[in-house]
Structure formats: structure tokens, C-alpha cells
A protein has these predicted regions:
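Alpha-helical structural context
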Residues: 21-23, 40, 139, 242, ...
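Conserved flavin/dinucleotide-binding core of flavoenzymes
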Residues: 180-339
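Aromatic-acidic/polar surface patches that form glycan- and anion
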Residues: 8, 70-73, 77, 120, ...
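A structural signal for the hydrophobic beta-strands that form the central parallel beta-sheet
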Residues: 95-97, 129, 286
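Active-site catalytic microenvironments for nucleophilic, acid-base chemistry
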Residues: 87, 94, 135, 142, ...
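Active-site/ligand-binding neighborhood in enzyme catalytic cores
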Residues: 1-104, 112
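Short, surface-exposed acidic
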Residues: 23-33, 148-157, 245-252
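Mid-domain catalytic core of redox enzymes
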Residues: 99-246
Length: 339
């Protein structure tokens, strides 16, 4: 009931304390809160604030039916975003792929330069650092020590930490399941995605023989220190508990991807250190899910950060246009209950 009307405005309380305070049962924690909160926030209950755990629950399950819809790309992300890149280029945007920036600098005339690793220098009137927090800190560290942008933002960076994700890719010689995806309970694996079935929606030719499954382990702190073989063996054993066909199937190919810096952790008390997009000042803007979006470390938060940064740049040019899409409206009875 705590989250029916909304969620806390402050982020000081860890979600583990809320679970204890509201006397959640072990079964409720294992079979509901773990799949939902660990899967969404990619962290342990001790490292998640009640504010953002409550937001996930309220927005996904209570506020509206639309908020709980799950979108799964039916193609690799590199292809998924290719159309966006092509559209940007048609509008005059220049994209420099496989290019890293070594340093940035503020010019006397108020413009900015970004120097790439190949020595090329790019100049702009406004500069948006749309980067993870550690890369933002790296580039801010290339500014002069007395630079106001460095002094305003860099000290807050020490309060941010990462959480890892591990994905296991398995190619079997036969069909394992007809499900497109599934949440797995009482396992280290939170989600199974049937990539063979999901990609059939692309409509691009015949589906390959066998089946390709992707398994996701959120908050995979233990797996970061495990070997590839240990992770694979444990994952296959857990998968077989739900899909017995696995035991008689042959694994044709497999892969394990550990992302130690997958997301930032919404640890209790972090909100006070999350900068607004225009917090740096001087035509330097910040974007990234870790900035002050009002959302946790999710794709929704990342999209909001980009739009908020674009709004800030537009404001600097005297344009007050809103680019942030409105939040989903409450529906049904929730219209009366949502704060």
C-alpha cells in the first residue's frame, strides 16, 4: 500500500530497510521483489533506495496498464539505432564513429574544443558530455584545476559507484522452449530471452535451426569473480530446472559477457549529488542516466537525460521549447489515488 499513491520524495532509506519495516515475507521477497527490483535497478536491496524501488513498482504495476508493457528489440542494437543515425546525418549531423575524445577545453571566446585520440580538434559553441559518470569525470579532469565546470561537478563524482550485469548466450541444437521470454524464480538468472523466437519478428528470412537463448544475471557481483566455465555450468543447470529439454540438448556455441560497469547504483542519499544537465555552466552540458533525471539507472532515465540536456542547450539559446515527453498519465482508479 505504501506505493499506491506514489513513492517517497527523498532517497535516504535503503530498500532493505523498507522490506524489514513492512514485514515482507521471504517468499514475497524471492518471488516478487527480487525479480522486479533487482531486475530493474540491477543492484542489491541494500544499495537501492526505497524511493527508486517504489518508483519502479508504482510506474510499472500500479499507475497505468501502459507502464508495464515490456519492449524487446527484435534486432541487434547496432541495427536498431542505425536508422536514427541515418536520419541524423540527413539533417546535417556529422557522426565520428570509433573515435574517442582525450580532452576538452574552454576557449576564451566561450566556445569549446574536444581533442580526439587521433589529434583532430572539434570546436562547438555548446558541448554535451553524454557519457557514463566515470568518463565524464575523466574529461572534466582534463580541464584546468580552477575551471568552474571542474570544480562544480568533479567532487560529486566520488559518490557514484557501478553495478555489474552478466549475460550468458547459449546456442542449442534443438528447441528448448516456445516462450519468447521468461522471468526465472529462485535462481541467479533473472530473465531468459529466446532470441531465436524474438528475431522472427524481423521478417528477414528463415529462422536458423536449433535455438539461441540469452540469460541475464543482474547485480552479478559474484559472477564477476567467477570463471567462464563456472558461470556456464551454473546457468545451464538452472535453466534445466525450468526447461528439462536442456539436459538432452547439445550446446553448439556459448558466450559469457561480464559488464562490470553496466549501470550506476542508486544508493541511498545519491540524489543530492546527481547534477542537473546545466549544472556545469559555461555552455557545457551533461547527459546520462546518472544525472538528475528523477529516474533510476534505466533506459527511460537515459532517454530523459538526453532530452533534458537538449532542453538546456535550447534554453541557453533563448528557446523555451519542452522536449521531454510527458509522463504516462494515471488511468482508472489510480487517477484518484496517485499523488
Amino acid at each position: 500500500l505504501d506505493f499506491i499513491g506514489g513513492y517517497p520524495n527523498t532517497d535516504e532509506e535503503p530498500f532493505s530497510a523498507w522490506l524489514k519495516r513492512t514485514k515482507q515475507t521471504d517468499r514475497a521477497i524471492r518471488h516478487f521483489w527480487e525479480p522486479v527490483i533487482v531486475g530493474a535497478l540491477n543492484d542489491t536491496f541494500e544499495r537501492c533506495s526505497t524511493r527508486y524501488a517504489g518508483q519502479v513498482f508504482h510506474e510499472s504495476f500500479l499507475k497505468s496498464a501502459e507502464g508495464g508493457r515490456l519492449g524487446i528489440p527484435s534486432q541487434p542494437l547496432s541495427e536498431f539505432y542505425a536508422a536514427v543515425a541515418q536520419q541524423a546525418e540527413k539533417q546535417g549531423t556529422r557522426l565520428h564513429v570509433r573515435t574517442s575524445i582525450d580532452r576538452i577545453a574552454a576557449m576564451p571566446d566561450g566556445t569549446w574544443t574536444a581533442t580526439a585520440s587521433d589529434g583532430s580538434v572539434h570546436r562547438a559553441g555548446s558541448l554535451i558530455l553524454a557519457l557514463p559518470f566515470e568518463q565524464t569525470a575523466r574529461l572534466l579532469g582534463t580541464l584546468a584545476e580552477n575551471a568552474v565546470q571542474r570544480q562544480r561537478i568533479l567532487p560529486a563524482m566520488e559518490h557514484f559507484i557501478h553495478a555489474p550485469i552478466t549475460t550468458i548466450h547459449l546456442w542449442f541444437d534443438r528447441e528448448i522452449t516456445e516462450l519468447d521470454h521468461a522471468a526465472l524464480l529462485d535462481t541467479r538468472i533473472q530473465w531468459m530471452f529466446n532470441k531465436s523466437r524474438i528475431r522472427r519478428f524481423e521478417g528477414g528470412g528463415a529462422v536458423e535451426a536449433g535455438q539461441y537463448l540469452e540469460l541475464v544475471i543482474s547485480a552479478s557481483f559474484a559472477e564477476i569473480h567467477a570463471t567462464r566455465e563456472e558461470i556456464l555450468a551454473a546457468a545451464v543447470e538452472e535453466l534445466a530446472c525450468f526447461f528439462p529439454t536442456v539436459r538432452g540438448a547439445k550446446i553448439l556455441r556459448s558466450g559469457v559477457l561480464k559488464e562490470a560497469r553496466a549501470t550506476f547504483s542508486v544508493v541511498p542519499g545519491l540524489d543530492q549529488y546527481r547534477p542537473a544537465p546545466d549544472a556545469a555552466g559555461g555552455n557545457l552540458y551533461l547527459a546520462g542516466d546518472w544525472t538528475r533525471t528523477g529516474w533510476p539507472s534505466t533506459m527511460e532515465g537515459a532517454v530523459r537525460s538526453g532530452r533534458l540536456a537538449a532542453e538546456a542547450v535550447a534554453r541557453g539559446a533563448g528557446n523555451q521549447e519542452r522536449l521531454l515527453s510527458p509522463d504516462l498519465a494515471a488511468t482508472g482508479l489510480m487517477k484518484l489515488l496517485t499523488r
